[in-house]
Amino acid sequence: MNRFRIALIWIAGVASSPFAAEPPATQRFEVAVAPGLLPGPTDGRLLIVLGKGDGEPRRNIGRTGMNTPPVLGADVDRFAPGVVGVVDHGSEIFPIESLSKLPAGEYQIQAVFDWNPDLRLPDAPGNLFSKPKKVMLDPTAGFTVKLELTEQIPPEKLPADSAQVRFLRFESKKLSVFHGRPMYLRAGVALPREFATEPDRKFPLVVFIGGYGTRYTIANRVGAFLRSGTPMVILCLDGAGPYGDPYQVNSENNGPYGDAVTQELIPHVEREFRCFGDPRARFTTGSSTGGWVSLALQVFYPDFFNGCWSFAPDPVDFRAYELIDIYSDANAYVNRFGFERPGMRLINGDTVYTVRHETQLENVLGRRNSWWRSGKDWCAWNAVFGPRGDDGQPKPLWHPKTGAIDRSVVETWKQKDLRRVLESNWKSLAPRLAGKIHIYVGDADDYFLNNAVRLLETATRRFDPPFDGVIQFGAMQGHGYHPVNEMKEIADRFQKAGVK
């Protein structure tokens, strides 16, 4: 018997042996859609959330941390009644490594179909979801769970107006031209008590921007700022757009949000709510995302606003994009010492999660398994700061799996590096920004945002003419550092401007 024949007999024997390895068990979710919910065959992202206990697991979509309910994601193209969307063991998953690692037990399962192209939110109008379903799952035994999308997020409806809060939604011509479809700006407006009692009086305008993804409905809460004897109109911008928070500036991917806000929204609000319409009577403020936006609006539109109060701003110098130096680092996930790069810390320095952990979640949420289409933080930054790819989508700064940084996109990012913008244009900007910039950050910021502010502050020491502004650090203070009453300071600056 020759060796080749012996080998064949041995292989056949192993294949038929009772001790041969069993094929891996299949873990699979099959999702159908009820008739009448989609306008036609529709592309989107199908998400499966595996919760514990009662309630709706979909409410947990977007949470980070190792204890968050697992969520899986897969694309479904041309989804329609009669088409089965499949999410299985090969799909992207968070926070565990794979579906085979899921602990056996009872789960409350819910499916979501995210397809709204204008608002990258799981609960955006038109998105579909299933009713929760309790199922026993054991990955070692395998399973197939069938779900049906029967529920739909209702059409957008503005909250009810009140005596001191009004809400707006109107079509932006600039954004509609860019996107080739109707695009809308939404805003909340908090009015001072004097608006009703002094009908001939005009007011300064404060543009308020909240933390990441804060919606315009925050106007119901910011009205409390007006109780301190600072009569002004507060305009609350909306932190939702095609790639998450649009950051209210012009970008290659989101379109001309900055121009839409300054040339369409603000003039409309000033006419409607008796504002002065004078640059000396316009101000910006916000924290975190709002900290960056308030500063960016002041820098990119230096003659349009009379001051910004920026708290814990998102990275203002891309040498410290949190802990990533986009100009010299090779990898977003691993630092130059070979260790995983933290993405959030406690005040004592302990790591809460890493950049890789955050991006794993965004790869689940993003179409084509891509963090740069997730609608979350890294996605939004990439869309605002980076270039548009040949496919019409944002070009990613780094590879979704390896974290390797693509140096070819960095040139576009420089245009939104606020330290570089100020440095490169300081001769022109200095007189137009005199006394207008106020930045505050804790030097133990949860997201390492103090590092970029420190680099900016160091750069301003070399400015000629000298920098006329405030950059203040709070010792051992985290992301909530807020040492001044900005409304009082804004009121004081407005009074000194002598606007009549």
Q: What do these predicted regions represent?
A:
Residues G51-K500:
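Non-catalytic cap/lid and distal C-terminal segments of serine-dependent acyl enzymes
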Residues M1-R3:
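N-terminal secretory signal peptides that target proteins for export/translocation
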Residues S16, A21-E22, A190, K202:
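Selective for proline/serine-rich intrinsically disordered segments
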Residues P23-D54, F167-F170:
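Mature N-terminal segment immediately following signal peptide/propeptide cleavage
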Residues E22-P23, R461:
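Beta-rich accessory regions
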